[in-house]
Amino acid sequence: MNAFKKRIFLSGLCLLVIVGGGFIAARPDLYFSIKKNFTIFSEVFRTVSVDYVDEVDPGELIHTAINAMLGTLDPYTVLIDERENQELDIIATSKYAGVGLEVGARGGKVVVIAPIEGYSASRKGVKAGDVLLTVNGQKVDNLSLDEIQNQLQGEPNTDVTLVVKRYGIEQPILFNLKRQEIVVHNVTYSGFVDPDSTIGYILIRQFGQNTSKEVEKALLRLKKNGHLRGLILDLRNNPGGLLSEAVGTVDLFEPPGREVVSTKGRNPENNSTYYTSAPAVFPNGGMAVLLNNGSASASEIVAGALQDLDRAVIIGQRSFGKGLVQIVKPLAYNTALKLTTAKYYTPSGRCIQAINYTHDQDYGAERVPDSLRKAYETHNGRTVFGGMGIEPDILIKPEKLGLLQIALLQQSQYFFFASRYTADHPKFVSQSVSDSLFSAFKEYLNAEHFHYQIPAQRYLSKLKTRLISTDSIQAMRPINTLDSLLVRYKEHAFAREAPEIREELYLEILSRYYGQKGKIRAELATDPDVQSAVKVLDNHEKYDRILAVKN
C-alpha cells in the first residue's frame, strides 16, 4: 500500500487517516438518495458539456461544482490538488528534495529570506536579502511563488540555476545548485533562556514527522548541558501537524497510561482514544506552554492535554480553536479529498472548536456563545471551558504595533536596509542599535522616499475632495490646519516608537550575521511571554497555586 495512504494527520494543515469502504451501516434511503442525485447531476453535467450554446471546459465545470458542494460544509473540507498533495507529503515525511532556500515576496520583489544551513544554496554562498532574477532560465517576474518553489524543488541530484541581484555588486550573480534531500526541522530552536538560567526553551514550528523525537533530543541535550529545572514549550503560531507527534510530545512529560486526546465522529470507526505509552523524559520539572491565536489543532491538543493534566501553566493568548478532525482520502490523478469526520476532545472531555458550522442557510457559521460553553474540571479540580480554544492560565495581551512600525514591516524596510548594511559591514557585534545606526536607517528611508498614511489622513483626504467640489473655502481652513497637525504627528512618530523600531532593526540585522537561531536567542531576553513564563517558573508558590497543586 502506498505510504501516503497510511499517514495520520491532525492540524490546521490536516489529518491523514485510512477510512474503511464507504458508509458503514448506512440507511437504505441514504443509498437511494445518493444514487438518485448523482444520476441527476451526471445527466446535467453531460447535457451542459455537449449541448450548451458556447463551448465549456468540462474540468472547470466539475471543479466549480465540487467546490460549491464542499463550500456548504466547513472550510477544512476541500479538494486538494497535486501541488497541495506535495505539501502534505512534506509534512508527512519532514523531507523533500530542493536546494535549501526559503524565498518570499518583499517590497514587490522575490527575495531570499534565509538559506538553510548545510545545503547547496548555503554552501555555494546564496545570502539572505539576495533578489531573485531568474530560476532555471525563467524570469521570476513571470512566476508565482508556488511556481518558483516548483522550480527549486524536484528530484535529488538534479541541477538548479539561480541568478540573483545582490546589493553592492553591480553584475547579477549566477549560482549552479544541486538538489538534495532536505530534512525539515520541526524544532527550530532549543536552548536555555540565557546562559546562566536553568530554564530551557523549545520552539516547535509544526508537528511534522519526528517532532517528538526532535523534542526528546532537545530535552536530553538541555539536561546534559546544564541543570534543567524548568521548561518553556513555545507553540505560538504553530498550525498543527501529525496527531501521533502531538501524542508523542505529551508522552515526554507524562507517565504511561494518561489520556491525551479522543476523537468522536458520526462513523464509529472514527472514534479513538490516545494515551501516553512511554516513560517520561521530563516528568517533574516546572513547565510553561506559550500559545497565541495562531496556535491550532495539534498544538491545541498538546496544550489542552498538559492543561487538563495540570502538568503545565498555559501563557499567552487564547488559541485558534480548531477542534475538527479531517481525513485525507487519495483520489484519482494525484488529487485528494480532505474531509471533516470527527471532533477531538481533551482529557477533561472538552471540545475546543470555536466556530459552529451549522449548515443552516439562515445562520451559517457562528462562534460558540459564552452562554453555551460548558465547564469541565482538570485533574486537580480547576475549572476549564470548552468551545473557544485553549484559554491561557496567564493572559498576556499582544503588543500593539504603532502605525509607523506597521508601515515599515509592510514595506519590508527593515529587510532591505539590513541587506545594505550587511554588504558594507563584514561584522556586527553590537548589543543594540546605536544612535548613528538609527540615524543611518532614517536617512535610508528618506532616500527611498518612504511614505505612509495614517487613517486620519485618508479620511481627511476624502473630506478635502468633497469640500473642493463645493468651493467651500471657509471650510478648508480648519481642514488645512488639521492636515498640518497630522503631518507633525507623523514626524514625531519616530521618537514615540523609537524603542520598538530599534529592537526590530537590531533583530533583522542580527539575523544576517548569526542566522535565525541567533535572532531567536536575542528575542528571548525581551519577549514578554517568555519573561512571564520565567517569572512563574521561578516562583514555586505561584506555580503550584495556578495548577492547584495539593501539597
How should each PLM-predicted stretch be described?
Residues 1-5:
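Short, Lys/Arg-rich N-terminal segment immediately upstream of the first membrane anchor
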Residues 9-24:
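Hydrophobic membrane-insertion alpha-helices, especially the h-region
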Residues 23-37, 41, 45-53, 57-58, ...:
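Cleft-lining beta-strand/loop regions that shape enzyme active-site pockets
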Residues 52-113, 157-189, 524-534, 542-549:
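Extended, small/polar residue-biased N-terminal targeting/export presequences
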Residues 114, 143, 176, 340, ...:
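Short linear motifs in exposed loops
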Residues 298, 310-311, 315-317, 321-382, ...:
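Polar, glycine-rich mid-to-C-terminal structural blocks
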Residues 351-551:
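Conserved functional hotspot residues or short segments at active or partner-binding sites
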